[in-house]
Amino acid sequence: QLRTLCADLQTLIRSETGHDAFIMIDQEGGAVTRLPESCINVPGSMALAATGDPETTYLAGKLTGEELRSLGVNFNLAPSVDVNCNPANPIIGVRSYGDTPATVAKYAAGMIRGLQDGGVLCLAKHFPGHGDTSLDSHLTLPCVDKPRDELERMELAPFRAAIADGVPAIMTAHILFPALDDSGVPATMSRRIVTGLLRGEMSFTGLVTSDCMEMQAVQKFFGSVNGVLAAMNAGVDLVLLSHTTLLSGEAAKAAAEALQSGKLDRKEMEESVDRILAAKAKLAAVPAAALMRSRPPP
């Protein structure tokens, strides 16, 4: 059923745009598993790291990538490279590979490589880091109020490693980082963080995606549509609205109007389109038929 749905979606999108669609999923493994039990599901990040063998993480990533691609899903919004450094964190916990940047970087590298070898795009999240919060950005707007040198040592280190390991995309966090941007907007909506830090200082040239703009960190404090426009102005390529079709339409209309009026920079939007099309070309180069496995029904 899922395979048929994804195939139908691709046919529709190709007929309308001439390009393949990104079909995304949150399939981290463990606590964040979206596929049914009849599919291949792997343990979560902390459990994989507990094996002490990064090759296990690679194999889990490759299995996950192959399973997703065989079903028609081509972009996995994983792994989390957040460092689990706050015991009071309500949302990361076992989704993290560990409580040190080195551990997270070591095991995330295998997952990033495995997912891509399995035939899907992946990303590192939640930039600049969701590990040291005591609040959940699904419900409210957290703040990580620590100096830049501490952010460099703890939060940013796994992202720098993921970039060096060739991660094709990075997802931003709806979190305030006053040491990086004191203007009162979360990372997703911050040009200083997305364009200045991630693109500039860290030299990341891949795709930047937002976390879902319907999360309360954005919706409650800024409004989802305003948040979408701010994220695009900040340098985010793919702005995610994961739940409400009507809201997606409103945001698309607002973005088109902002582009027409000059509130969105046309050159920057064209550069985003180029990055998106380059990523889709990379996916198209992977022969999906070679990844199809024949497994007996459950």
Residue positions per predicted region:
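Short, conserved acidic/polar surface loops in the N-terminal third of protein domains
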Residues: 33-38, 88-89
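Second-shell residues forming the walls of enzyme active-site clefts
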Residues: 1-17, 31-33, 99-268
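Active-site-adjacent structural elements in enzyme catalytic domains
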Residues: 2-14, 18-21, 52-70
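Divalent metal-dependent hydrolysis catalytic cores, especially in the metallo-beta-lactamase
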Residues: 74-79, 235, 239
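Short, conserved phosphate-binding/catalytic loop or strand-edge motifs used
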Residues: 81-91
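Mid-to-C-terminal alpha-helical segments outside catalytic/metal-binding sites
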Residues: 261-288
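A charged helix-plus-loop insertion that forms the helical arch/lid used to bind
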Residues: 39-52, 96-98
